[in-house]
Amino acid sequence: MAIQKLWKKGLIGALAISMLAACSDGSSSSNEVKSDLSLEEITKKAKEEGTVNSVGMPDTWANWVETWEELGTEYSLKHKDTDMSSAEELAKFEAEKDDATADIGDVGIAFGPIAKDKDLTLPYKTSYWDEIPDWAKDDEGHWIVGYTGTISFLTDKNNVKNAPKSWEDIKNGDYTVSIGDALTANQAQFAILAAAMAFGGDESNIQPGIDFFADLAKQGRLKGDPTVANLEKGEIDVAILWDFNSLGYRHQIDEKRFDVVIPSEGSVTSGYATIINKYAKNPHTAMLAREYILSDAGQENLAKGYARPIRDKVQLSQDVQKLLLPEEMYKNAQPVKDQKKWEETTKQIPQLYQEQVLIHGK
């Protein structure tokens, strides 16, 4: 899969979120679709529609390709995707309205509530509703997380003799660390939040995380951009990344050369959610696609792309389980409890990081 592309989907700063949230016009759709149909009825109507058009769900992202292929084989659905960011997906839904060319999209969890508030989504809970954690779904089914990411450490063992297992290990180490551009990158901002959580903070108190990275900067240990190219060249000692990126990068470069762990004191988990376009021309194929994404087969497809399934009860094959980190590594990882507070905090991070961390750059 295109791993580099995977983390770039998260390069959405608070500016894009706040701009979208401020632009709702409250208009409604003339395209009324029943979302309480049985799965049998949805399947019948989906086969009649025959096509599902997605946005932000390309073949190369999280192994979507197998899900689209299987929907084609099992239900004779044709598929087309237009790749774009979460913000662009919502803008497209809103701009096109009744002239919709997209039926379903995949967005960062922060964009789910915005899409609902802007009246752009069609609710559908699926057969797996009770297995989805409360934090990972809208109460009415307007958005549902399909897979998660948790902040992890990716260590180049050629450069670091004892790979860090905890934030405390990094604090006491002498190697360089990379999180990327925290002024704009969603992944880097979550890395700061994860560090904050480990040292007593939370989504409304990011200061412990800022202090952690400021100390690294003062020591000249905060370096570089954690790209595949830089990692391959050996320019990064420890990268702090989503677990799916760490695992994907390791697979892409050299399985034996890199160590991947979830920090033992704690980390933060976030996710990506499907949204069904309220104005969709093929609403039932979109519902069926969401249903399939949350099925055992759909969840396994995502896991093959190193994305961790949202359903804990899903039965993955042994070969696919081996692609992911052990479940016990996640025992101290937790999701953002208050998305609105986190949204406000992300607006403050660029200035805090610039004034308290980057100022010490060496």
Could you describe each region identified by the protein language model?
Residues 39-52, 57-78, 249:
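Short, polar/charged alpha-helical segment
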Residues 110-116, 232, 238-257:
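A ligand-binding cleft/hinge motif common to bilobed small-molecule-binding domains
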Residues 152-159, 192-198, 270-282, 293, ...:
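A bilobed periplasmic-binding-protein/Venus flytrap-type ligand-binding module shared by bacterial periplasmic
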Residues 331-362:
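Conserved C-terminal helix/tail region of periplasmic/extracytoplasmic solute-binding proteins
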